[in-house]
Amino acid sequence: MKGFISPLRISFVGGGTDMPFYYKKYRGEVITTAINKYTWVLINKWQSKNLLLKYSKSELVDSKKKIKHRLIKEIMKNYNFSGLDINFIADLPNRAGLGSSSSFTVALIGALEKFKGKKINKKKLAKAACDIEIKKLKDPIGKQDQYISAFGGLCHIIFKKNNVFVKKINIEKRKIINFEKSISLINTGIFRSAIKF
């Protein structure tokens, strides 16, 4: 079995400047942090040649073309695997404004790369996730979610026309503990999809 976990995120400042229409003309910058809530992807080989996908629904298909989940289908086009049992586990519900779709994408690509025996390069992983969501699926979203999900930690991310730069922000442990004590995440019960905006 191979697995990969990818964090959700909280964005502090700069959201929207990671959109292509903005950073290609100016430059985008965000301060964002990964949180200790995750998307987990676990992959097992099994005897059947079918693909068994277990997320909020279950799919059993004999061809990648028959996959209904749009993100999984697009990602699997890049791999020649068959006979896999792929399990998706999320600590929090999707559409909560915490970058869950990008965390899902990063986690699946990371798990598949590990299953192939490849070492994970964080920048390549983030770029691959951006290519899937933004270029292939044409989702009108930015790049910060994929990059913070791949890199983790507290980061200052700079978006330029042809490149992305990720700088880790180092803060004393004491200050991080005090900050964590002063914030709360509350489930409002209101969910939305970023691709509808």
Annotated model-derived regions:
Residues K2-F4, R9-G28, L42, N50-L51, ...:
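ATP-dependent small-molecule kinase catalytic core of the GHMP/sugar-kinase superfamily
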Residues G3, I35-I132:
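Anion-binding (especially nucleotide phosphate/pyrophosphate-binding) glycine-rich loop
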